[in-house]
């Protein structure tokens, strides 16, 4: 395995974008999109806590259904946790908006939210942000880095990584981004 330059856009066929939708923050990006040009297998490791945020419940449903994923929409600033049925409904609204903007199935849209717990998502800002993200997405390394920055809350730096490995005699690139509260 060898580390290569980039993050979520390092692998062929993956695009990303970021935007400042005004979810919570002013004058900084707070939404990111990761998009796969083709539907792909999705897997997840989820909390075992009885309290789960709406996006966790949504993503568990998507993964359990066996649907192929094609997009991940993430917002920072409001976690959409402890928001009840309304918060889960906003996940459906988010998936529907992404499906329409990207011309894909809503069943293949994963959602991530990070930030303040117990506050409802401003869904109008979120769906408007999705339209912007869809228009800005591309496969540049810069867009991947900007997406990693957009999901930060109290993080001190964006976290992204890409590696190349040999599988069956072919080189495969895997890219990703992550966030963590107060990460050093």
Role assignments for model-derived ranges:
Residues 1-184:
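Alpha/propeptide regions of enzymes that mature by internal proteolysis
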């Amino acid at each position: 395995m060898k580390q290569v330059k980039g993050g979520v856009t390092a692998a062929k066929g993956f695009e990303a974008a970021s935007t400042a939708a005004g979810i919570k923050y002013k004058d900084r990006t707070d939404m990111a999109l990761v998009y796969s040009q083709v539907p792909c297998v999705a897997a997840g490791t989820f909390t075992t806590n009885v309290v789960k945020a709406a996006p966790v419940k949504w993503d568990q449903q998507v993964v359990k259904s066996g649907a192929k994923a094609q997009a991940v929409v993430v917002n920072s600033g409001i976690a959409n946790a402890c928001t009840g049925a309304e918060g889960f409904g906003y996940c459906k609204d988010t998936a529907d908006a992404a499906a329409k903007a990207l011309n894909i199935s809503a069943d293949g849209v994963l959602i991530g939210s990070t930030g303040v717990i117990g506050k409802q998502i401003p869904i109008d800002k979120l769906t408007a942000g999705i339209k912007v993200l869809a228009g800005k997405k591309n496969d540049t390394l810069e867009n991947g880095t900007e997406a990693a920055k957009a999901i930060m809350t109290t993080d001190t730096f964006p976290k992204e990584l890409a590696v190349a490995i040999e599988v069956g005699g072919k080189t495969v690139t895997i890219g990703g981004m992550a966030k963590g509260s107060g990460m050093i």
